[in-house]
Amino acid sequence: STILFADNGLNLYGNAVLVNEAFAEENPEAVKGFLRALVKGFSDAVADPAAGVAAVLARNETLNSDIELERLGMANAMNIKTPYVIENGFGDVDMDRLAASIETLKVSMGLTGAVAAADVFDAQYLAPAAERMLP
């Protein structure tokens, strides 16, 4: 049985791509290209989990393919191909959810200062939603 934070009131984002603002401004096509490649990799792993696991095993032979396939299946079902992603495409965020996450982190980690969701997420580098839909 799996206990999910989101099922228990902690609806935080679990993964993010971070980029230095100066780098992004100076190299927008590199950032866009990286994000397109990331979406392609996730799309491929959702479409063919066994091939996704094989790609990981090629880089880390100590892993167990059966366990990794089970783990990827769980991740795809619970964290990657979510209802929000199905509707909006991979890589975008719900700004209200992100704002609430920031507030939760401020309280739990004792952070101070005003941080808006728009301060930490910029969708301008994402491909159009139609190009970010998972299979």
What is the meaning of each model-derived region?
Residues S1, Y13-V17, E21-A22:
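Small-molecule pocket liners
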Residues F5-Y13:
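Short Pro/Gly-enriched coil loops immediately N-terminal to beta-strands
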Residues E26-G110:
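Secondary-structure end/capping motifs
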Residues L98-P135:
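Conserved C-terminal helix/tail region of periplasmic/extracytoplasmic solute-binding proteins
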